[in-house]
Amino acid sequence: MKLPRLLYFHFSSNAINSVEFDRGKILSMSAQLIPVSDNGAAQSRRRVPRHVGFIPDGNRRWAVQNGLAKEKGYENGIAPGVALFEACKTLGIEEVSVFGFTQDNTRRPVAQSDHFRAACVVFAHEISRRGAALLVLGDEQSPQFPVELAQFRTRQGEGIKVNFLVNYGWEWDLDGLKEGGLRSAEVSRLDLIVRWGGGRRLSGFLPVQSVYADIFVIEELWPDFHPQHLEAALSWLEQQDPTLGG
């Protein structure tokens, strides 16, 4: 049976202009990304982090390198995200946090912001269908926040915890202290952060939870994700000494 194409077109203050993604293509692409195996090497891992953060950078650069408009990179980043989610489930990771887009990102051209917002909607609903206990964290009062994700502003589901940062800003997060607590208070301390695209920075990614996190950088661009990237990050983490400042 042919899966329907996904069309997002809304008449509201935070409308996403007409952006169409082919769900069948996305699912086919994610299925081709072989998940991290649960063989003896994975099962004998001495240190499986409880909470891992992911910064999937390089969508626009990937699009340009492949002769596409920059906004097309975001669609090609959905399937890797689904495959990464499945790999984390297989490994028994309890909680993951994923950068969708930041408040600063919304300054990009409209075509790009429409596409990354729509891509976030597709990804969020797909992992929710796959059993994620999903929390979308970001400024929902802004017109840049996709209305389709409002239902996930309180955590939904009972599986692996996924904190999806959508229209997130570190200042917005910390401003919650004026009202009694971090806006990300429900998110636990990070053990490991993995960033694609070669950047050596956190870009405001959960600054409080990141305080003792080890950081692993992957040079490949996000749409070129392969499960071996995650395996490499976890193997590297086993060699680190988690002193937590002690």
Model-derived regions: residue spans:
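Flexible, compositionally biased loop and terminal segments
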Residues: 26-246
